[in-house]
Amino acid sequence: QRPSILYVLPSNIGNLLGTVNVLMEWKRRMGYEVNYISSSAVVNNANNLKNYIENAYETWDNPPEFVTLVGDAEGSYDIPTHFENWSGYNGEGDHPYATLAGNDLFPEVFIGRLSFDTQSHLQTIISKTVNYESNPYMGENWFKRACLVGDASTSGVSCIITNDNIKEVLQNHGYEDIRTVYSGDFPSQMTSNLSQGLGFFNYRGFYGVSGYTIEDVSSANNGFM
């Protein structure tokens, strides 16, 4: 059975559908079954969207393994997100869209989001994605290199424990160069590792504690890696 992807598009996607079609057609060429939903009755309400994904998972002949939300949580082209209520912080996240069976927190599908505000942003995201997959940079073994960041100073030792577990999984899947950042100057170490090219990057901690900012993201330059 072919792998299946469900794209969730903003209800006002309009003439931008042609831009998204570039990505969807590429995925079909790769062998995926591709479906999309943009009905306002579904995509404008988080609960309705969750029910739609759950129904697809339970009843479709080829249910989605991957669900991609195309749009910001807020903005000109938006897909709503969820707000958790058990921490007291009302944290945002799309994970509930992936928990489709049972009363646990384990996902049944892979969930992701392509956030954009303008047509230009969307075109850039899709162009980079298609080029990355169709013409990967093979100049060095960067795709077997990983960086795991555990911000333990304030966030707690679980950040390191989580990354140590991830490191073991990566080693079992052939990763040869796994860097860990558990102390020191987090922004400079993260920027340095990202700029060298990584096949996998994970940050475990509370946002802002490490000192890594939007400006730091912009300063990373890893070319096609």
PLM features per residue range, with description:
Residues Q1-M225:
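Cysteine-dependent hydrolase recognition
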